[in-house]
């Protein structure tokens, strides 16, 4: 992508309305634009990051055996009245009527709709277990939206829903998502700590929030510091192994970890003083097991091996991609801008032409740009005629992991400079070596 032809509206000044680092940097880098209170457009640079976040989420959901579908954002109020939750959500739920005066709502979540899909199609235990998920925009009329897309009214959510014949089967499905979430956050460059949580209006009796530590977090968290060093389930993880996944769950829930809502001061004080960690954190995922709450209310049942009908046991599992993007920035930035983990960076490399219009610089940059693009790399080529300082500031601000810098003096010697955005390390090398570094 040539920067001269790209839409990336950079802001030179810090926006006054931005309270936290991620909101400020997302606005300055031209990733998002506020349309109204708590509602944002995702501009091209931001959407590239969001798409890569979603790709990782989708990959790990599929690995864990979940199946993707797509449900509508507008839902019938009748389903929510049937489950008994229509009034529980209060003013957070946006309620409307269609031209036939039928009550509708803009879905804040999808337990009712997916249960309706299940009950109309699945009749036998032989079709279980089943886990359905989708990635969709949702709306909750937050009383105080703030922090950009960290806490917005319209947001994107990956929500998955599991169906099992028994509680034991449902716990295995829960453990699958538990392990999948640990892997997902790790691939996004985050260390997430699972903490027992309140089930809230979703309901049920088992729930975990996944929290990343950040000074700007809304939650106060208390946990054992060993969580920071725990190994993440690797690619060899067998998602069909009941014992293997139970061992992962037991390990990650064996030590004390809780947000302020579930905090037990006496239990925390039982942790050796040197092992206690008190901090602030950001919720990046939430999983629930709620048994037969919805299946009983909505008649979702299957015929069991005994020939009798059984209400299915359900769980739901949410990750907010539009919340994850600012969370990653909160965890990875410096005074100059964003430092993206390679897995979600909008571009892999930015090629900086220090003197656009100089034939040697132009030819060198075109050569590098073509070679890296052909090798399948996402490359941003800064071919603008901006000053060198502006080019460097832009590259640092948007956080692309590597910069290849081509100036007249270096190019005359057949060389370019490669900068690592994370470490700041710079290395001069031949043009061929620079290309081979990223395509070998």
UniProtKB/Swiss-Prot annotation:
Q: What is its EC number?
A: 6.1.1.15
Where's it mainly located? Answer: cytoplasm
Q: Where in the cell is it found?
A: Cytoplasm
Q: List GO terms (cellular component aspect).
A: cytosol
- InterPro entries (UniProt xref): aa-tRNA-synt_IIb, aa-tRNA-synth_II, aa-tRNA-synth_II/BPL/LPL, Anticodon-bd, Anticodon-bd_dom_sf, Pro-tRNA-ligase_IIa, Pro-tRNA-synth_IIa_bac-type, Pro-tRNA_synthetase
Pfam families the record matches: HGTP_anticodon, tRNA-synt_2b
What catalytic activity does the UniProt entry give for this protein? tRNA(Pro) + L-proline + ATP = L-prolyl-tRNA(Pro) + AMP + diphosphate
Which residue windows are coiled coil?
none
Q: Name one GO molecular function term.
A: ATP binding
UniProt GO BP: prolyl-tRNA aminoacylation
| Assigned keywords, A-Z | Aminoacyl-tRNA synthetase, ATP-binding, Cytoplasm, Ligase, Nucleotide-binding, Protein biosynthesis
Please give the family membership noted in the entry: Belongs to the class-II aminoacyl-tRNA synthetase family. ProS type 2 subfamily.
| Function field | Catalyzes the attachment of proline to tRNA(Pro) in a two-step reaction: proline is first activated by ATP to form Pro-AMP and then transferred to the acceptor end of tRNA(Pro).
Q: How does this protein assemble?
A: Homodimer.
Listed name of the protein: Proline--tRNA ligase
